[in-house]
Amino acid sequence: MQTQRLRIAIQKKGRLSKESQALLKKCGVKFNVMGERLVVHSENMPIDLLLVRDDDIPGLIMDGVVDLGFIGENELEEVRLDRKALGEPYEFVQLRRLDFGGCRLSIAIDKDEEYNGPQDLAGKRIATTYPQLLKAYMDEVGVPFSTCMLTGSVEVAPRAGLADAIADLVSTGATLEANGLKEAEIIFKSKATLIQRTGEFDADKVALIEKLLTRMQGVQQAKESKYIMLHAPAEKLDQIKALLPGAEDPTVLPLSADKQKVAVHLVSTENLFWETMEQLKELGASSILVLPIEKMME
């Protein structure tokens, strides 16, 4: 059933929940998540947030129950492959890959085990909560194996005698190390993504989605950019600009107290490292300020 309000599914709890909510708030969507409520209404836009389990989000999109969803690509692809195998709807539109929620699905083995490549996994029993992604990879490399399906605590499976290896999400590798495991193969790299259901939308929803996407782009650009202010010798301006790749043409203003220097203001999309600041100083720049940017719109 379609409504006039834009319905967005986000993870109720977990690694993507806070960052998805924070992104929406930075885009100007006002809402207040309280208690165990499953539906939260925006205070200033015709938007409803559905707080659900992450593995339910792809299905809600593919069945057309909600309009948009924030989801990890690993969960999205696992559900897509599963629904495709079952003959269920599995189509969606990927609107934007986001800059958070990065992880990888990896096969891990005993830390003392020698490993020379995927062929060493032949005949092994591999524990995972992502059987479809694991099967897709093992089929691609042509290695036979068996699956031990678990819903949690996958990393303990080898020590418990349930499996020879595991396929699980890895961020830093600390959990693997704590359980005597090492990463052998990366089989899927993932980030958070914003997806949309297929089908028609009315004009108001199309306009609202476009507004959100534009604002998300602005938030992401701002996160990747810095506002730089400095004083510089006028004759060194070209050399200073060359040290700041990714910068637009700067705003250059005369200094009232020193006619030989100018004030330079610019936005740079590159990280400004200490070495660069030291090089700027060597060229005669002073009062160098590097500031974060909250929002941008081109």
Curated annotation (Swiss-Prot):
Example GO biological process: L-histidine biosynthetic process
Gene3D superfamilies with a match to the protein in the record: 3.30.70.120, Periplasmic binding protein-like II (3.40.190.10)
E.C. number(s) listed in UniProt: 2.4.2.17
KW Ribosomal protein (keyword) present: no
UniProt keywords, alphabetically: Amino-acid biosynthesis, ATP-binding, Cytoplasm, Glycosyltransferase, Histidine biosynthesis, Magnesium, Metal-binding, Nucleotide-binding, Transferase
Swiss-Prot/TrEMBL catalytic activity: 1-(5-phospho-beta-D-ribosyl)-ATP + diphosphate = 5-phospho-alpha-D-ribose 1-diphosphate + ATP
Regulation of its activity: Feedback inhibited by histidine.
Functional pathway: Amino-acid biosynthesis; L-histidine biosynthesis; L-histidine from 5-phospho-alpha-D-ribose 1-diphosphate: step 1/9
SUPFAM superfamilies reported for this sequence: GlnB-like, Periplasmic binding protein-like II
Top EC category: transferase
Major place of residence: cytoplasm
Any one GO molecular function term: ATP binding
UniProt cofactor(s): Mg(2+)
Pfam families (alphabetical): HisG, HisG_C
Places the protein is found: Cytoplasm
Top-level taxon in the UniProt lineage: Bacteria
Record-linked PANTHER family: ATP PHOSPHORIBOSYLTRANSFERASE (PTHR21403:SF8), ATP PHOSPHORIBOSYLTRANSFERASE ATP-PRTASE (PTHR21403)
Family listed: Belongs to the ATP phosphoribosyltransferase family. Long subfamily.
HAMAP family xref list: HisG_Long
Role, per record: Catalyzes the condensation of ATP and 5-phosphoribose 1-diphosphate to form N'-(5'-phosphoribosyl)-ATP (PR-ATP). Has a crucial role in the pathway because the rate of histidine biosynthesis seems to be controlled primarily by regulation of HisG enzymatic activity.
Record's protein name: ATP phosphoribosyltransferase
Organism (species): Vibrio campbellii (strain ATCC BAA-1116)
Origin organism lineage: Bacteria, Pseudomonadati, Pseudomonadota, Gammaproteobacteria, Vibrionales
